Amino acid sequence: MFLGTHHPKLDDKGRLTLPAKFREALAGGLMVTKGQDHCLYVFPRAEFEQMARKVAEAPFTNESVRAYQRYLFAGTDEQQPDGQGRISIAAELRRYAGLTKECVVIGAINRLEIWNAERWQTYLDEHEEDYAQAREEVLPGVF
C-alpha cells in the first residue's frame, strides 16, 4: 500500500529518486502514465497489467473506448528503477505534468502520483473545503 507525501527532486537528466519505502514494491518494474489533474501515475507493473486487461475488455468498436485506450497506452512508459532507486521520466510525461526540479510524490493506495510541487499545493488549497464533503460521500459515518 502506498501512503504518505515525499519531496524528491528531478535531476537534470529527468530522473526522479523514488522514496526508499516504496522501492521494494516497485522492484519488479513499474509503469508511469498520465494521470488526472496533470499528475503522473506510477503503478507496479502487475497492478498496471491487471488494469490494462480490464481496459482491453471494453468494446473497441466504441469510439470513446478506442480514444481512452490510445490516450492511456500511448502515454505509458515502462521503467525499472536503477540501483539508486531512480527512474527516468520521459520528456512528454514531464511536459504533461509540468515537472520541474521540485516534485511531490504522494501515495494513493495502489499507485504513486508525481506532481509538480506548485501544482500540488494549488490542488490542496483549492480542494481543502471539498475534503469534508467528499469524505462523507466516500466513507459515510466512518470519520
From Swiss-Prot:
Superkingdom of origin: Bacteria
Entry-linked Pfam families: MraZ (PF02381)
Q: Where is the SpoVT-AbrB domain?
A: 5-47, 76-119
Q: Which CDD domains match?
A: MraZ_C, MraZ_N
Recorded coiled-coil stretches: none
Q: InterPro entries per the record?
A: MraZ, MraZ_C, MraZ_dom, MraZ_N, MraZ_sf, SpoVT-AbrB_dom, SpoVT-AbrB_sf
HAMAP family, per this entry?
A: MraZ
Instruction: Provide the protein name.
Output: Transcriptional regulator MraZ
